[in-house]
Amino acid sequence: MRDLLIDYERFVATGKPFGRAVVTSVWGSAPRPEGSSMLATSDGRIAGSVSGGCVESATALEIEAAIQRKTPKLVTFGVSDERAWEVGLACGGTIKVFVEPAVKPQLLEAAQGKTGQVMVSVIAGTGLGEAVRVLETGEIEGQFSVALPLDAISEAAGAALRREASTSRDVETSTGSVTLFFEVFPRHPRLVIFGAGQIAAALVPLAKALGYHTIVADGRKVFLDAERFPTAGELILAWPEEAFERIGLDSACYICLLSHDPKFDEPALKVALRSPAAYVGAIGSKKTQVSRRERLRELGLSDEEIGRLHGPIGLNLGGRQPAET
């Protein structure tokens, strides 16, 4: 759903009602995993994908029907081997898609949120369409009309969040079986770049295309020009310590130091290598990396902390241009 937020705003602006479909189960080979979403308006416009080929057309019709009746529905699409290639299922199979007449506000908040969250929805059984939101702390926001094991739901949501994989499961209640769909929204990955040079300008659009929220920081105003970084999520004019403090480094941060200047890189590394960031890398040759590590030891960093540093970074393609690096 996160990749459809711009389309969501576009559809809202039309004033036309629109609904959503999300893949809840896949059997066989499929190009779109559980959690893949699609939006469709009442007049047939679509955004996103749940599979390919005729499944999209059929799903759009199901969304239109859900809008008309104002109720959700779990739909099963079975694909024969003969039609498999047409819809992108290399070996045939079955797809289950949950169709809703509108996008829930909680779902939108989860998709927009920076912290990890899981939407848990009833896709079959009593309470069809009801949902709660489970935060990465395990706290549950919202409630179901039927008594469900909330502790077990919180635990299952946490496990799905750690795997970063949406999934469905059946839960037995006093009134019968209920099928829940755990739609995972991991922490939004952030690429933090310090050093707004040519390589940074080439890296930002690539990272954005891969789904990263990009942040470019530099203490030199002349380099931090918005025209050079039209696709950057944020530009921060600050030196490393201040920039990282403002960003709030966490386990969803991937840090690339591209300044090529020890007086900027080393203070930044001292903070970054002691942070919970998932990745810390610095540009520079193998020779530069050796001397850099020695200076980091002199600054008091431990071998374990220094061992987190990736370098040289970039691809050794034999190229010289920023985009090639």
Residue positions per predicted region:
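Redox-cofactor binding/interface segments in oxidoreductases and associated redox assembly factors
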Residues: 237, 257-258, 282
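Short loop/turn elements that flank and shape the SAM/SAH-binding pocket of Class I
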Residues: 241-246, 316
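Short, glycine/polar-rich helix-capping loops at beta-to-alpha or helix-loop-helix junctions
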Residues: 221-226, 264-265
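Conserved SAM-binding strand-loop segment of SAM-dependent methyltransferases
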Residues: 233-239
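Rossmann-fold NAD(P) dinucleotide-binding segment
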Residues: 263-277
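Segments forming oxygen-rich coordination pockets for charged ligands
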Residues: 1-219, 227, 236, 245, ...
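Adenosine-phosphate binding glycine-rich loop
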Residues: 97, 277-278, 282-325
